[in-house]
Amino acid sequence: MSVLELLPAIDVTGGQAVRLSSGSVDAGSWGSPIDVARSFDEAGARWVHLVDLDLAFGRGENSELLARVIRETPVRVELSGGITSRAAIEAGLAMGPERVNVATQALARIDDVCEAVDSFGERVAVCLDVRGDRLAARGGCGEGSDVWEVLRVLNEAGVARV
């Protein structure tokens, strides 16, 4: 039986770890993402979910900083934010996280996601944004697909984490 493990999230925009409130950055800053990752490690977290909000929303990126977080902290990292293509999966994995979390938008090219899973195995997880029983991808890519059909395809492709 698999075990549920909750991952604390570090959302990064403009080089700072930020607090989100209902999806908005209005809640303020936590400061350095490296310091936040270290504090989660000291509190006993085995993993963090590290998100590049700027890349996810198409307003820049924080790749160098996130690579430093991955290198300089002992906590295991699931990297997320703007990972919507095979090239983005490869670039994300090259930064050194344990795994990347592919955005729902990438499912508009589900064959590419399945090929990446075939190449990288459990290092590729898939995020599904769902409303009811339909995908609800930001930007409309893949929006409206039946979640159960998508789960069937991902399961057949060997996706271990959704």
Predicted feature residues:
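Glycine-rich, proline-tolerant flexible connector loops at the mouths of alpha/beta enzymes
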Residues: 47-65, 104
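Alpha-helix-loop-beta-strand connector modules within alpha/beta enzyme cores
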Residues: 58-81, 111-130
